[in-house]
């Protein structure tokens, strides 16, 4: 006889298949031709791949990250791929003054914004909580407060253009997982703030969409290095994740789960939270 956990998992999987069957992908790459995009965390990983996709679709892009030399290389490649315009601005989002400066730069150079894509993250160890409160404060500034500041600064121009805010988050902002205490806290904060803001924008009839992107483990160098030997989950391709994020933002989805099976997993957790099942995906060999 199937156990209750197995029944719920089977039901969640069946629902996901049913939704996939009836959902029709209406994405047209042409709709991003000439779109004005501010993309953060654009120097590596998912952000770099998003930059190349947007360039291929003919967007106008402002790239930002900390490393200027790398941004220059990404900009050059974007131009060869077909971007109509590309600018870059180095910025360290641990500084509270940077978000306003970055948005002003983007608006001045592009004449406005259609998409604000928030993707940057601060480096955080993948380990048990060690009591580093100062690191958590710093991480909240980079991973959360700077997102709030960027979105706040960009809302006026996004509203004029019926634009979109695309927030790259993580399953750790929906389901608390081990080894990610500080990181998970920042992602839960993103979910709470932007989900609440979405309600308020709708109630005020302000035509700005917010797409929250919930990602699993992605095969970026940084993620693979940190999780090696600690997580029993296959990593998904960064280029595919980047494209899924762009499509979700263009479709003005409320939430996007990538890979797709994270959605039934999250639904299962909401219905039947089971810490032991969750912990079975992690390897803890410490004291």
From Swiss-Prot:
Sequence positions that bind NADP(+): 41-67, 92-93, 119-121, 183-187, 216-222
Residues given in the record as substrate binding sites: 170
Name of the protein in its database record: Hydroxysteroid 11-beta-dehydrogenase 1-like protein
Catalysis: reaction(s): cortisone + NADPH + H(+) = cortisol + NADP(+)
Keyword S-adenosyl-L-methionine: no
Broad EC category: oxidoreductase
Subcellular localization: Secreted
Assigned keywords, A-Z: NADP, Oxidoreductase, Secreted, Signal
Cross-referenced SUPFAM superfamilies: NAD(P)-binding Rossmann-fold domains (SSF51735)
UniProt record similarity statement: Belongs to the short-chain dehydrogenases/reductases (SDR) family.
GO molecular function: oxidoreductase activity
The protein's Enzyme Commission number: 1.1.1.-
Signal peptide residue numbers: 1-20
Annotated organism of origin: Gallus gallus (Chicken)
Functional summary from the UniProt entry: Unidirectional NADP(+)-dependent cortisol dehydrogenase (in vitro).
Keyword Transcription assigned: no
A single GO cellular-component term on record: extracellular region
């Amino acid at each position: 006889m199937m156990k209750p956990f197995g029944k719920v998992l089977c039901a969640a999987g069946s629902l996901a298949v049913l939704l996939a069957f009836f959902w029709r992908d209406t994405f047209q790459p042409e709709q991003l031709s000439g779109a004005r995009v501010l993309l953060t965390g654009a120097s590596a990983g998912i952000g770099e791949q998003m930059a190349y996709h947007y360039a291929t679709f003919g967007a106008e892009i402002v790239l930002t990250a900390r490393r200027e030399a790398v941004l220059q290389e990404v900009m050059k490649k974007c131009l060869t791929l077909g971007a109509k315009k590309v600018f870059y601005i180095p910025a360290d989002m641990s500084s509270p003054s940077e978000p306003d400066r970055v948005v002003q730069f983007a608006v001045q150079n592009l004449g406005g914004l259609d998409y604000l894509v928030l993707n940057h993250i601060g480096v955080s160890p993948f380990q048990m909580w060690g009591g580093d409160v100062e690191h958590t404060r710093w991480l909240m500034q980079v991973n959360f407060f700077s997102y709030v500041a960027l979105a706040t600064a960009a809302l006026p121009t996004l509203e004029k253009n019926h634009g979109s805010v695309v927030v790259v988050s993580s399953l750790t902002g929906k389901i608390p997982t081990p080894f990610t205490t500080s990181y998970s806290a920042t992602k839960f904060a993103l979910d709470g703030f932007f989900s609440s803001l979405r309600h308020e924008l709708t109630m005020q009839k302000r035509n700005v969409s917010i797409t929250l992107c919930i990602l699993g483990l992605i095969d970026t160098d940084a993620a693979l290095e940190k999780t090696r030997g600690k997580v029993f989950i296959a990593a998904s391709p960064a280029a595919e994740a980047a494209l899924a994020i762009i499509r979700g933002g263009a479709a003005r989805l409320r939430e996007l789960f990538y890979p797709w099976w994270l959605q039934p997993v999250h639904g299962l957790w909401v219905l039947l939270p089971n810490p032991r099942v969750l912990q079975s995906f992690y390897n803890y060999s410490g004291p």
